[in-house]
From Swiss-Prot:
<comment type="similarity">
    <text>Belongs to the SspI family.</text>
</comment>
<dbReference type="GO" id="GO:0030436">
    <property type="term" value="P:asexual sporulation"/>
</dbReference>
<keyword id="KW-0749">Sporulation</keyword>
<dbReference type="GO" id="GO:0030435">
    <property type="term" value="P:sporulation resulting in formation of a cellular spore"/>
</dbReference>
<dbReference type="Pfam" id="PF14098">
    <property type="entry name" value="SSPI"/>
</dbReference>
<protein>
    <recommendedName>
        <fullName>Small, acid-soluble spore protein I</fullName>
    </recommendedName>
</protein>
<dbReference type="InterPro" id="IPR017525">
    <property type="entry name" value="SspI"/>
</dbReference>
Length: 71
């Protein structure tokens, strides 16, 4: 991912409160536009970098559960 894109995404949300961050995430997901995926990736990177090992394990369990094939 281009470093400039990473910085631009972070600059766009720096200082946002939880409600604003949630709106950004929900809007990006609901839009279904692939151009939003890099931004969501940057936000996930920030979450991952600031998460404890316990929180990382919980995220991985959630991700694994969400990616299991339908039975």
């Amino acid at each position: 991912m281009d470093l400039n894109l990473r910085h631009a995404v972070i600059a766009n949300v720096t200082g946002n409160n939880q409600e604003q961050l949630e709106h950004t995430i929900v809007d990006a997901i609901q839009s279904g536009e692939e151009k939003m995926l890099p931004g969501l990736g940057v936000l996930f990177e920030v979450i991952w970098q600031h998460a404890s090992e316990s929180e990382k394990n919980e995220m991985l369990k959630t991700l694994e559960g969400g990616l299991k094939p339908a039975e």
